[in-house]
């Protein structure tokens, strides 16, 4: 039987929502092993004077729980 833990992470990029999601996953991979599924939960923009400054993507990510 397998157990999975779910966390939410947010990535940001000046280029696109896809780059923001990729950045979030790449950063999470540095400290979380065995990532399984990433679901896009929310996307938003940081604006200044009506211009896009930052794309932000919130992800719900699951990974296999190994216990302590």
Question: Which residue ranges define each predicted feature?
Answer:
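Compositionally biased, disordered extreme N-termini, encompassing classical targeting presequences
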Residues: 1-2, 68
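Short, well-ordered alpha-helical segments
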Residues: 2-35
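Broad gene-expression machinery/nucleic-acid interaction feature
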Residues: 4-6, 42, 54-60
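Flexible glycine-/small-residue-rich
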Residues: 11-13, 42, 59, 63-65
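Short, conserved loop-to-beta-strand elements that form functional interface hotspots
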Residues: 38-47
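C-terminal structural segments of small proteins and small subunits
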Residues: 50-68
């Amino acid at each position: 039987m397998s157990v999975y833990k779910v966390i939410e992470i947010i990535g940001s990029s000046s280029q696109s929502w896809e780059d923001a999601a990729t950045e979030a996953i790449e950063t999470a991979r540095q400290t979380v092993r065995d990532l399984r599924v990433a679901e896009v939960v929310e996307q938003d923009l940081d604006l200044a004077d009506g211009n896009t400054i930052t794309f932000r993507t919130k992800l719900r990510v699951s990974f296999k729980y190994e216990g302590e």
